[in-house]
Structure formats: C-alpha cells, structure tokens
A protein has these predicted regions:
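A short, flexible loop at the N-terminus of ABC-type nucleotide-binding domains that lies
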Residues: 7-11, 20-34, 84
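ABC ATPase NBD coupling module
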Residues: 25-26, 79-93, 101, 123-130, ...
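The feature captures the beta-strand-to-loop junction immediately N-terminal to the Walker
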Residues: 48-50
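Helix-to-loop junction immediately C-terminal to a conserved catalytic motif
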Residues: 63
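Conserved ABC transporter NBD signature motif
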Residues: 71-79, 239-241
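H-loop/switch region of ABC-family ATPase nucleotide-binding domains
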Residues: 216-217
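Conserved beta-strand-loop-alpha-helix hinge in the C-terminal portion
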Residues: 236-260
C-alpha cells in the first residue's frame, strides 16, 4: 500500500499541454509551454503571473476554447483534450472577468438560472421554471446577501455589474461542476462589490468542496485564499506552493519570485 497516496481522487489532469498561437506568422506567440498540473477533489488553486504568463490561456485550454498542439487534459476521468466547450459543459463551469459574459442578456434572473440548471443538457426554458425550482433559486441566491432572491423576475440587463457577476457565480455552481474556473472574476468590480463576490465565492467553494482554479492579480487574495498557489511565467508553471509553504508566503516573497522569473528570462535572452 502506498502511504503517500493522496486521500482525494484526481479531478483535473493536465499533461504536457502546449499551445502556440499564430504559428508561422508575424504575431506568433507561445501561450503554453508543456504545462503539467494535477488537481484533486476539493483543491482550490490560485494562479498568478504577469501579463502574458499563460494564466487565462491555461483556463481556456481546460474549458475547451481550443485544442492543444500537444499534451492531454483529463477531467473527472474523461479525456476531454479535443472536446469543444459545449461538450465539456457538464464538467467545467467558468466565470469570466466581464460580468456581461456569464449571463444571457434580455432574460430575467430566474430564466438565467433555469438555463444554468440544465447545464450539460439542452439549454431550453421549456418546463424549466416551476415552484420547486424557484425555491432552489431563492436558496441559491440568498447567501449572496444582495437581495437577488427577491428579483427573480428582473431582467438581468437592469442589474449592476456586481449583481450580474454574483449571478454568474451562482449559475456556475448551481449544478456542481467537476472543475470551476474563475478568470479574474472580481477584477472589473468596485472594491466593495469585489469583496462581496469573493466572499460568496469562498463560501460556496468551501461548502461544496468544488475543485477550483482561480486566476487573480491580487497578491493578497493569492495568499489568503486556496490551499495551493501556482505562479506562471512564459507559459510554464514557474513555482508552486501548498500547505505550510503557502501559509508562509508574503507579498514581498511573491514579488521577489516575480523578479527572479524575469531575471532568468533576461539571462536566457
């Protein structure tokens, strides 16, 4: 028996994933350079890195926005390497930086939630709204503490950016995904709203133990949240910390690692 085996099953496996955009053209850019990453059930990994480090590209690869040039991606035991976004919808939920991208314009709060409840199946409103489901929606919205549970009939176009982002979060986890990816989902919000959405995120992720990958530029969030921290640079995983090593991190130590990565790049070039 392997006493060092992880007590939780592997949910996400990224192996040797590479991606180059505009290959052979003037704007050629290497987005991912042989990324290896494993997340177990309940892991909450925070991803940091400078602009162009590959953070959002990694999330896009996991979500299915493109097929990698090389490597493999497995989610909940299923090889999804070549599956497009809609074929991963039952496994991966995503919240974008732009609050407008996570909800369907022109529909009410309730109608958006009804669509989210059918994630991974046919997204239709037919027979989607009932008293029982309305109760589910109210219970899902109440913990946000911003009154959306009283605005089920409100068109989402009338919501503020923060309210819409909070709704996007609830929609993403209404049907628990295998993996939740958060791409700087608080970056476009004012500080007060960002704190509320982040608190709701942490509460929801912890309560359901959802395996989560969150990109942020907020160093304090990177230190305070999650059980793992990953730093990316030039499309690679430059540094990783978990457990006591993560708890010991400080903002100055992270800044120092950023500088070290840049210095290594300068030496290579």
């Amino acid at each position: 028996m392997n006493m060092l085996a992880h007590p939780e099953p592997v949910v996400l496996s990224v192996r040797g994933v590479e991606k180059t955009f505009n290959r052979g053209k003037a704007g050629e850019r290497r987005g991912l350079a042989g990324v290896d990453l494993t997340l177990h059930h309940g892991d909450f990994a925070i991803v940091i890195g400078s602009n162009g480090a590959g953070k959002s590209t990694l999330l896009s690869a996991i979500a299915g926005d493109f097929v990698p040039d090389a490597g493999a991606i497995t989610i909940a035991g299923k090889d999804v390497t070549t599956r497009p976004v809609h074929q991963r919808a039952a496994l991966v939920s995503r919240v974008f930086q732009d609050p407008m991208r996570g909800t369907a314009a022109g529909l009410t709060v309730e109608e958006n939630l009804a669509i989210a409840l059918r994630r991974g199946g046919r997204r239709s409103l037919t027979n989607a709204i009932s008293a029982r489901r309305r109760k589910i929606f109210v219970e899902a919205l109440e913990p946000l503490g911003i009154g959306l549970e009283k605005r089920l009939d409100t068109n989402v176009d009338l919501l503020s950016g923060g309210q819409r982002q909070a709704l996007s979060l609830v929609m993403a986890i209404l049907v628990e995904p295998a993996v939740l990816v958060l791409d700087e989902h608080c970056a476009a919000l004012d500080p007060r709203t960002a704190e509320a959405v982040m608190n709701a995120t942490i509460s929801a992720v912890r309560a359901a133990r959802i395996t989560t990958l969150m990109v942020t530029h907020n160093m304090q969030h990177a230190i305070d949240y999650g059980n793992r921290l990953i730093m990316m640079h030039e499309g690679r995983l430059e540094f990783e910390a978990g457990g006591e090593a993560k708890s010991a991190l400080t903002i100055p130590s992270l800044v120092s690692r950023f500088r070290s990565a840049d210095d290594k790049l300068l030496l290579v070039r």
